Amino acid sequence: NEAARHKLLDVIGDLALIGMKIRGKVTAEKPGHSINAKFAQKISEVIKADRKNILPKLDFDKKPLMDSNHIMNIIPHRPPFLLIDEVLEISESHVIGLRRVEESESWVKGHFPGAPVMPGVLQIEFMAQAGGVLVLNTVPDPENYLTFFMKMDKCKFKNTVVPGDILICKLELISPIRRGIIHMKGQTFVGDEIKSEGEFMAKIIKKDTL
């Protein structure tokens, strides 16, 4: 009947908030938008926990999908503030970027003298730039857009990053991009050791609307 069909469409629409296809069977008893949304949120939390700290094996000798020149065709950042050197993987929902942490970087002498440690804010910016590549890679004219931070949450710095490290970041969409709003989870690694992580919200805006 019409009421049952309406409820079924509500379930389908609410579960679409997960941002992934469900491979399985869903049985709904007395569904409603509120309980549907809570169920979708619970599934998203399970997916996030399952993916935590998972980084695929990477071959640093393999030619990257994008080098710095390609990256600069997508995001507006330029040296010395271009913090992502290479993109190793990219899809509609995730990106893996690489940063070679060098002795010659401007912060090395002062943060801290004799014991250089990469500032956490630069690790966040590295993840943000990788996220910018992920998002702007979805539009045909990325040179006409800018990405602005809206919010950072759950940021943690677990281990130090030092000159000589090859820093990897992995960014994943937490939910589909809607109305130019992006919600992402990011992590950085050296080897299989997690260095930092956080969740980020950003918005893409056309330059001519500023």
Question: Where are the model-predicted features located?
Answer:
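Terminal domain-initiation and capping elements
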Residues: 1-60, 78
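An exposure/low-complexity boundary signal
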Residues: 2-3, 7-12, 153-175
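Active-site helix/loop of acyl-thioester processing domains in fatty-acid/polyketide metabolism
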Residues: 5-18, 87, 118-142
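Hydrophobic beta-strand-centered segment that forms part of the acyl-chain substrate-binding groove
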Residues: 21-28, 53-65, 131-168, 195, ...
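Non-catalytic linker/capping segments at the edges of enzyme domains
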Residues: 49-117, 145-146, 161-162, 174-178, ...
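Residues located in well-ordered beta-strands
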Residues: 83-86, 151, 156, 170-172, ...
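Short aromatic-glycine-enriched beta-strand elements
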Residues: 180-185
